[in-house]
Amino acid sequence: MLHIKSIPAFNDNYIWLIQNSDRRCAVVDPGDAAPVLEYLAHHELTLDAILITHHHHDHIGGVPELVRQFPGVDVVGPKNEPIPTLTHPVDDGDQLELFGEVFLVLGLSGHTAGHIGYVGDAKLFCGDVLFSAGCGRIMEGTPQQMFDALNKITALPQETEVYCAHEYTAANIAFALAVEPDNQHLQQYRDQVNRLRAQNKSTIPTNLRQEKFINPFLRYTEPSVVKSVSNRTEQTDPLSVFTALRAWKNEF
């Protein structure tokens, strides 16, 4: 069984640490090496692998220093993105073994052109694609690509835990409630998140079952969501509703 720990970085990033029972570990999207090295030293862990979801600096900035400190560490990441430190470029459908668990690589283009995720042991590391109550900005891809990426994620088992890379939940809930002010699941989740954040606790991981009740970007066929965006698009097909939602969130 793998154990997952969060290492906070910058203002709102999470670097995820995946640990086995033998004090060996991997990290996901280490934008900063310093907090990772501090955690590894404090807990006497050895770094075996670095998993990268996309090329943005707040996800890869710490990789060169970690490679210097741990020569021979595997650096796994998207083959279609400009990341010079990769030792193991991977793409959609590839598999990798990590501490006895098989992880499947998912192509999740949209936020960036070559964004990927990793799913295994009922855990999804999805970078900046799916957030709790939200989704990533479409910075290099198209609405269709992000739409397809989210649908690929929602096809996973509903118990899948979602480890996204940022603590955006409270802000996402504010937007989600603007879309669905009468959503009781959202109202309850807002209260839960407010309690956690008041104690400086993380709201992540979330899970797919919960997100389907609260995340407007997964609820684009719900009548309440379609009605909310009706003044922004005359189309009611799922992609048009999703695209209108993402444009609305950009200016929210």
From Swiss-Prot:
Belongs to the metallo-beta-lactamase superfamily. Glyoxalase II family. This is Hydroxyacylglutathione hydrolase. It comes from the Bacteria. Zn(2+) 2 binds at D58, H59, D128, H166. It catalyses: an S-(2-hydroxyacyl)glutathione + H2O = a 2-hydroxy carboxylate + glutathione + H(+). It comes from Vibrio atlanticus (strain LGP32) (Vibrio splendidus (strain Mel32)). Zn(2+) 1 binds at H54, H56, H111, D128. Pathway: Secondary metabolite metabolism; methylglyoxal degradation; (R)-lactate from methylglyoxal: step 2/2.
